[in-house]
């Protein structure tokens, strides 16, 4: 089983985000993302949260998944506007993923 590298997980999340954002985000959020991403945008891999079971209804092994956030950072380099949180299987053969979109 080949694991996704952090760069691969980030690239996959960003590709999915670009493909699905228009169907899952409000037009104002899409405009904000497009206007601000070059200056303040971030795509970051974070420690996999253990509360995904509450979000998706399935118990997961945090070590088997990568969590990637896509959003905008503030002047303190903190991501304070998250457009999507991705849970992506580390198994490169299994492209399973879940997304929580900004509501």
Curated annotation (Swiss-Prot):
This is Putative double-stranded DNA mimic protein HAPS_1002. May act as a double-stranded DNA (dsDNA) mimic. Probably regulates the activity of a dsDNA-binding protein. HAMAP family: Put_dsDNA_mimic (MF_00680). Belongs to the putative dsDNA mimic protein family. NCBIfam families: PRK05094.1 (NF003469). Pfam families: DUF440. Coiled coil: none annotated. It comes from Glaesserella parasuis serovar 5 (strain SH0165) (Haemophilus parasuis).
